Amino acid sequence: AKPDFVYICLAGVDQTTFLKQYKEFGLSFPLAGGVMDTIPFWAAGIDSLSGHWQSLWYHGLTTPQSVAFTKKFSGQFGYPPDNQAWGDYVAAKILCQAIAETKSTDSAKLIEYFEKGASFDILKARKGSFRKRDHQLLQEMYVVKVKDKAKVKDKWDICELVEAVPKASESLELIQ
């Protein structure tokens, strides 16, 4: 068989294990998969990576707020933030904004605030908001491509951003 690519839908350490074994077995078909977790990709190493992936956030984003977050985080910890660090930071930021604007920590008041369409700076080009019917955070995601080894600056520099999805002219509901 000569597939165009191999799609994997694994998370966490299962990604790392798969990527390393895929390399060990000498398989060369391009890879693609569900949401890329940055830390398992760093653990697998650039030699075990290939293909296109989905990402919620990547430290290579160039929005001013992402650049500032990455710079501050990297300065404090010595490596760039991964997508989990971004998620933790953004969740705390959203909650602080909601508490400040409602002047309350009451769950019902916070839910009402979120359901009325409040928008949040989530370190991306587009703001995020919560959908009323299921409280899903509506946000853009990214297609990332594993970098050519010759272009990699360090072990953290593994991907390049291809595009944001959905496009700026499209509703965030498109991918939710």
PLM feature spans:
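Extracytosolic ligand-binding ectodomains
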Residues: A1-Q176
